[in-house]
Regions:
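Structural signature of eukaryotic scaffold interfaces centered on beta-propeller domains
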Residues: 8-12, 54-61, 114-123, 174-186, ...
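Loop/turn-rich, solvent-exposed surfaces of beta-rich toroidal or solenoidal domains
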Residues: 174-251
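Entry beta-strands of beta-propeller and related beta-repeat scaffolds
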Residues: 16-17, 64-67, 124-128, 187-191, ...
Length: 288
């Protein structure tokens, strides 16, 4: 539909998938085999009084679709520290719950262009990357929260707030938000942390400034640390993926545009192993 701004797809089966349409507040249900529409799930009644609701990244667990909800004003910004999701039953395609947390001091659940901003670990705990206000509005904060296995509420006792969590090895000490995140295993996630203080023009020209630095996140210990030897990228060249036992980072930095590898076991950084023109914004390996 016009103005839909489709951003994320999750597949329930060969006959049913969901696409979030952030521009019109709808999750569309469709058949991914025949590519025919099944239904629209309208979420606009979940909007706040001063914002519109934009469904973003999604994940399915135990027959329930969890949809990150971005509440945005006319400037595409949140107005309060609410973490919100919609929970939809995959069998009926009905909204069963509007999940809201107002106590953890975070907002903007999931990033629409980053499917990894909502993920599940080996324990089937769901983790959500909250973008906050992209670092533009003090007090509207970014970080990570979770929904534990067996629960449909945001865990009130677990969070990583970036305004309160010092990033080990980061010269500016604190990150504004996690631009993209990739869960590996054993409670370890890899991300690009955005800190506008890394570039003198960070806030003046946020789309091309060098403000994104690779970090490793220990979800169990709730720590964030810079990966030593990695370059600082602009916010467009921030791919993260895995190839065999290596974590692969796309980076558009002062020295090169290309892909770098990080070995979690040896901590070795190599690269660029491949150089590209433009911004290395996506990576996928077909190796098991």
């Amino acid at each position: 539909p016009a103005g839909a701004a489709a951003c994320n797809i999750v597949e329930a089966s060969s006959e049913k998938a969901y696409v979030s349409l952030q521009g019109i507040g709808v999750v569309m249900v469709f058949n991914p085999t025949t590519m025919t529409k099944i239904a629209d799930i309208d979420l606009n009644n979940l909007k706040q009084s001063d914002t519109r609701v934009a469904p973003a990244a999604m994940i399915i667990r135990d027959g329930k679709l969890f949809v990150g909800l971005n509440q945005m004003n006319a400037q595409y910004m949140p107005t309060r520290n609410n973490i919100e999701l919609a929970m939809i039953d995959v069998k009926t395609d009905k909204v069963e719950k509007h999940i809201v947390n107002t106590t953890l001091g975070l907002c903007f659940a999931t990033r629409p262009i980053d499917p990894g901003s909502i993920f599940m670990d080996e324990n089937k705990d769901i983790y959500i990357n909250c973008i906050g206000s992209f670092g533009f509005i003090p007090g509207l904060n970014g970080g990570i929260v979770r929904i534990k296995n067996g629960s449909t509420d945001i865990d009130p006792d677990y969070y990583i707030r970036l305004d309160k969590t010092e990033v080990v090895g980061l010269t500016t000490k604190y990150a504004n938000f996690l631009s993209t995140i990739f869960y590996a295993d054993n409670g370890k996630a890899y991300a690009y942390a955005n800190s506008f203080g890394l570039d003198p023009d960070g806030l003046k020209n946020p789309y091309v400034s060098l403000t994104n630095i690779p970090v490793v996140i220990d979800l169990k210990q709730k720590t964030v640390a810079v990966i030593k030897g990695m370059e600082i990228s602009n916010p467009q060249g921030i791919a993260i993926g895995r190839h065999k036992n290596l974590i692969v980072f796309g980076s558009a930095n002062k020295k090169a545009n290309g892909f770098y590898t990080y070995n979690p076991d040896t901590k070795e950084v190599v690269g660029p192993v491949v150089q590209v023109k433009g911004n290395p914004s996506f990576f996928h390996s077909f190796e098991k």
